[in-house]
């Protein structure tokens, strides 16, 4: 099990943030990046050849930029939700919906006037792409996420204004991309994997709702709903290689969950989000033995 004191320090640090959700999100993002950088062993990758879709034109301080939105059946699809459900999710929590995509390397090209420009290939799941073709909302959402992803990955500042290229599905040539081949299954709910301690009375601590998902192939994130709590005071958390145990103050909550993945407990971090009344846990995963 991980050292409860170490995790308790993380809870206290987030507690001081209070209701400032923006700073909390920044803290969680920073923790996630640190965890991903700590992983030195990466799963093997496989090459895919994305298929052309459509091309948009924008610019940066360096000049013209083209983004080729491509697709491949090898890219995992996002969660299957309606546009109404998606809109509600985005209004409640902008980080609650994820569209898996592969961001390709920049490649130099020449535009129609023979002037130099830069192009990027962004690939999404093929079935999702076909659905996106019939939805302006999904298309604009994908373009926004792709643009922000390229900005983060390559330290760019792209103009949010863009124009779709007519009669030109891509700029230049679409290169092969490497994606991780050892994709672990996306985990949404682990309620049926929950294993309560034997002999616990029905009137005992409540089992909180647990939601987990893979933020990256080597990073597992968890949200534990704790509506009866206003802060992290009295919370205890222990993490083993494949187990998460949480206790609440005054025995309000108790969670003992088996997780069928190998967790790096020493690098795990936790924070309590006061506004959402959730315990957020970021857990890097140990490499799968070859």
From Swiss-Prot:
InterPro entries: PIH1/Kintoun_subfamily, PIH1_N, PIH1D1/2/3_CS-like. Keywords: Nucleus, Phosphoprotein, Transcription, Transcription regulation. It is found in: Nucleus. Changing residue 64 to A: Abolishes binding to ECD, EFTUD2, RPB1, TELO2 and UBR5. Expressed at low levels in normal mammary epithelial cells (at protein level). Highest expression in lung, leukocyte and placenta. Expressed at lower levels in brain, prostate, colon, heart, small intestine, liver, ovary, pancreas, skeletal muscle, spleen, testis and thymus. The keyword Transmembrane helix does not apply. Pfam families: PIH1 (PF08190), PIH1_CS (PF18201). GO terms for cellular component: cytoplasm; nucleolus; nucleus; pre-snoRNP complex; R2TP complex; ribonucleoprotein complex; RPAP3/R2TP/prefoldin-like complex. The record marks 57, 64, 113 as: Interacts with TELO2. Its main location: nucleus. One of its GO terms (molecular function) is histone reader activity. The modification Phosphoserine is found at residues 12, 173. GO terms for biological process: box C/D snoRNP assembly; chromatin remodeling; epithelial cell differentiation; positive regulation of glucose mediated signaling pathway; positive regulation of protein serine/threonine kinase activity; positive regulation of TORC1 signaling; positive regulation of transcription of nucleolar large rRNA by RNA polymerase I; protein stabilization. It comes from the Eukaryota. Component of the R2TP complex composed at least of RUVBL1, RUVBL2, RPAP3 and PIHD1. Component of the PAQosome complex which is responsible for the biogenesis of several protein complexes and which consists of R2TP complex members RUVBL1, RUVBL2, RPAP3 and PIH1D1, URI complex members PFDN2, PFDN6, PDRG1, UXT and URI1 as well as ASDURF, POLR2E and DNAAF10/WDR92. Interacts with phosphorylated TELO2 and mediates interaction of TELO2 with the R2TP complex. Interacts with phosphorylated ECD, EFTUD2/SNRP116, RPB1 and UBR5 and with RPB1 in a phosphorylation-independent manner. Belongs to the PIH1 family. This is PIH1 domain-containing protein 1. It comes from Homo sapiens.
């Amino acid at each position: 099990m991980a050292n409860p004191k170490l995790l308790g320090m993380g809870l206290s640090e987030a507690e001081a943030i209070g209701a400032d959700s923006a700073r909390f999100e920044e803290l969680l993002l920073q923790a996630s990046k640190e965890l991903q950088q700590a992983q030195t062993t990466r799963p093997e990758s496989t090459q895919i050849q994305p298929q052309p879709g459509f091309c948009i034109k924008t610019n940066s301080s360096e000049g013209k930029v083209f983004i080729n939105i491509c697709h491949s059946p090898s890219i995992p699809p996002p969660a299957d939700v309606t546009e109404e459900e998606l809109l509600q999710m985005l209004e409640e929590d902008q980080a609650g919906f994820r569209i898996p995509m592969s961001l390709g390397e920049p490649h130099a090209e020449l535009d129609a006037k023979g002037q130099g420009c830069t192009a990027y290939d962004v690939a999404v799941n093929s079935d999702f792409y076909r659905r996106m073709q019939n939805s302006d909302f999904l298309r604009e959402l994908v373009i926004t996420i792709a643009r922000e992803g390229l900005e983060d990955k390559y330290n760019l500042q792209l103009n949010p204004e863009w124009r779709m290229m007519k009669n030109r599905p891509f700029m230049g040539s679409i290169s092969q991309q490497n994606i991780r081949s050892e994709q672990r299954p996306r985990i949404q709910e682990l309620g049926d994997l929950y294993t309560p301690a034997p002999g616990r009375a029905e009137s005992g601590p409540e089992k909180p709702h647990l939601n987990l998902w893979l933020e990256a192939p080597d990073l597992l994130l968890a949200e534990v709903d704790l509506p009866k709590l206003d802060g992290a005071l009295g919370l205890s958390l222990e993490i083993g290689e494949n187990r998460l145990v949480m206790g609440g103050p005054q025995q309000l909550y108790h969670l003992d969950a088996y997780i069928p993945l190998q967790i790096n407990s020493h690098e795990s971090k936790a924070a309590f989000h006061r506004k959402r009344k959730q315990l957020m846990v970021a857990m890097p995963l140990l490499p799968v033995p070859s």
